[in-house]
Design a protein with these regions (language model features):
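Active-site gating/metal-coordination segments in enzymes
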Residues: 1-98, 104-107, 120, 133-135, ...
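Conserved, mostly hydrophobic/aromatic
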Residues: 16, 46, 83, 118, ...
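Alpha-helical packing segments of well-folded alpha/beta enzyme cores
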Residues: 31, 79, 98-101, 142, ...
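Non-cysteine beta-strand/loop elements that form the S-adenosyl-L-methionine
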Residues: 41-51, 113-119, 152-157, 201
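Glycine-enriched alpha-helix->loop->beta-strand junction motifs that scaffold or abut catalytic
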Residues: 41-42, 84-89, 108-115, 148-152, ...
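Histidine/acidic-residue-rich catalytic or RNA/ligand-binding cores of hydrolases
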Residues: 102-103, 125-129, 162-172, 208-222, ...
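Aromatic-lined glycan-binding groove of carbohydrate-active enzymes
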Residues: 135-167
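Mid-to-C-terminal alpha-helical segments outside catalytic/metal-binding sites
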Residues: 186-190, 194-201, 208-253
Length: 253
């Protein structure tokens, strides 16, 4: 619609990250070629949800759980190669125990940009404070390990999802940005310290994050957490990294 020119200077979907199942292997090439023919100036990458929870607890928040063992599928790597050969990026939605598998993928395809979604999704659902702390330590270890690969970026957000164990989704009172910032700060700061602002981008993950908070307090919380950052760091977090990774030629607002 935006490309039709009927809506003036509208730049809706200036860049698109589509879906494809990499388990199709080499057959994925034809699908990607058709997608690129349809949106040659807009298709930037592919995203696949690959979250796995052996306990099954997380799936009560996921109406249609993704298949298990996606990255272990015998055709997955060849499917990824089709994506890589076309210069597309890959958005990986996984829980933190799976980050090592994504790291192996980054090592195998060093010229392809991989974007870790939702800050690496620390899976701490239904845990008490001690349990969440143990998960935080393991998540931090995994995030720091994958950050060593220069072709990996981190999308900071998704913190309103229930998987983190904050239990904001159980609340009935409005949650303000300061309370969100206090809970989220260790995760946001860890991600930025691991990747650097130049490889991090802020995301709203809305409406899924609406389980926990409103759109305005969400963004205010993220901005509040990094309020002491330099102007260059803020520009990277809220504009430059996303513009570079997804090749979006839009001026800063």
């Amino acid at each position: 619609m935006a490309a039709s020119g009927f809506f003036g200077e509208c730049r809706i979907c200036a860049a698109i990250v589509g879906y494809a199942d990499l388990r199709f292997g080499d057959e994925l090439g034809d699908y990607l070629d058709r997608a690129l023919e349809r949106a040659p100036e807009r298709l930037r990458g592919i995203r696949q949800v690959m979250i796995e929870d052996p306990t099954g607890a997380a799936y009560r928040f996921v109406p249609i759980p993704p298949p298990s063992g996606v990255m272990q599928h015998p055709n997955f790597e060849s499917g990824f190669r089709q994506l890589a050969q076309r210069g597309l990026s890959f958005d990986a939605a996984v829980f933190h125990p799976q980050l090592s598998e994504v790291a192996a993928l980054a090592a195998a395809f060093p010229d392809t940009t991989i974007v870790i979604n939702h800050t690496g999704h620390a899976l701490a659902l239904d845990l008490d404070a001690d349990g969440r702390e143990r998960v935080f330590v393991e998540w931090r270890k995994q995030l720091r390990a994958i950050a060593r690969y220069p072709n990996v970026c981190c999308k900071i957000g998704g913190l309103g999802l229930p998987f983190w164990g904050f239990r904001f989704e159980e609340r009935t009172d409005p949650i303000g940005y300061l309370e969100l910032a206090d809970a989220w700060r260790p995760y946001v700061e860890t991600a930025i310290e691991a990747f650097g602002a130049e490889r991090c981008m802020m995301e709203s993950d809305y409406p899924p994050d609406s389980r926990s908070c409103g759109y305005v307090p969400l963004w205010n919380a993220l901005k509040h957490i990094v309020r002491a950052a330099s102007n260059d760091e803020k520009a990277a977090l809220f504009h430059h990294t996303a513009a570079r990774v997804y090749r979006i030629e839009l001026p800063m607002l």
